[in-house]
Amino acid sequence: MCIRDSAKPSSKVTTPSTAAIAALKKLNIKKISIFTPYPQKLNNQVVSFFKDEKFQVTSNSYLDIDSDSDIWKVDPDFLYEVLTNMDHGDADAVFISCTALPVLQIIQKLEKNLNKFVLSSNQVLIWDTLEKIGQNNSISGFGKLFNSN
């Protein structure tokens, strides 16, 4: 028996991974481009996870950073340039993995530039949490996902 089930069986739970899947399904996205700050091995696990969930990964790029304490120091302007110049193929959306990566403030700008949905770990966590507790999750300034209701 799962500890959560014995403690609070009706608990609503989300993770960055499950929230990303929920958001991609809500938006009817099938093809994604994935960006991570992780080392290659962990990056490849992220890609495999989405492939196992039946998403077509059109492209992938990663920064090869080992430590969360270094990931949060990545400059958002640098991220914007990297993501703008990344070949996303014919992806319908870009998923940016990692809750430590400072990407929330550039999502809307990226969506406008790339003309694609841009989803990040923190963004989908916020969206899915609000969705699960039945709160209005229409929030401006953090991407088109929040306008999908």
Residue ranges: model-predicted function:
Residues 33-34, 54-60, 114-122, 137-141:
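Short hydrophobic/aromatic-enriched beta-strand-loop microsegments
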Residues 30-41, 77-87, 136-149:
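A polyampholytic, Gly/Pro-enriched intrinsically disordered region
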Residues 6-66, 146-147:
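Conserved beta-alpha
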Residues 65-68, 116-138:
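Short, flexible loop segments at boundaries between secondary-structure elements
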Residues 41-97:
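Active-site rim beta-loop-alpha module in soluble metabolic enzymes
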Residues 1-3:
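Short, small-residue-biased leader/transition segments that mark boundaries at the very start
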Residues 79-80, 98-104, 114, 120-121:
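Catalytic alpha/beta core domains of metabolic enzymes, predominantly
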